[in-house]
Amino acid sequence: DQGTACTGEHAHNFCLNGGTCRHIQSLGEYYCICPEGYTGHRCEK
């Protein structure tokens, strides 16, 4: 489950370094799809 696009504050502020925020509603979790070269929960590494 790749989730859905994040909305509101999460859409713009959750992921770092150009990552794409995704929301998994069934888990209430947010995660990021990171651009190449970045890793970490919020693409911070």
Swiss-Prot record:
<keyword id="KW-0964">Secreted</keyword>
<comment type="function">
    <text>Has both toxic and EGF activity.</text>
</comment>
<keyword id="KW-1015">Disulfide bond</keyword>
<feature type="disulfide bond">
    <location>
        <begin position="15"/>
        <end position="32"/>
    </location>
</feature>
<keyword id="KW-0245">EGF-like domain</keyword>
<comment type="similarity">
    <text>Belongs to the EGF domain peptide family.</text>
</comment>
<dbReference type="Pfam" id="PF00008">
    <property type="entry name" value="EGF"/>
</dbReference>
<protein>
    <recommendedName>
        <fullName>Toxin Bcs III 15.09</fullName>
    </recommendedName>
</protein>
<feature type="disulfide bond">
    <location>
        <begin position="34"/>
        <end position="43"/>
    </location>
</feature>
<feature type="disulfide bond">
    <location>
        <begin position="6"/>
        <end position="21"/>
    </location>
</feature>
<keyword id="KW-0800">Toxin</keyword>
<dbReference type="GO" id="GO:0042151">
    <property type="term" value="C:nematocyst"/>
</dbReference>
<dbReference type="GO" id="GO:0090729">
    <property type="term" value="F:toxin activity"/>
</dbReference>
<keyword id="KW-0166">Nematocyst</keyword>
<feature type="domain" description="EGF-like">
    <location>
        <begin position="2"/>
        <end position="44"/>
    </location>
</feature>
<dbReference type="InterPro" id="IPR000742">
    <property type="entry name" value="EGF-like_dom"/>
</dbReference>
<dbReference type="GO" id="GO:0005576">
    <property type="term" value="C:extracellular region"/>
</dbReference>
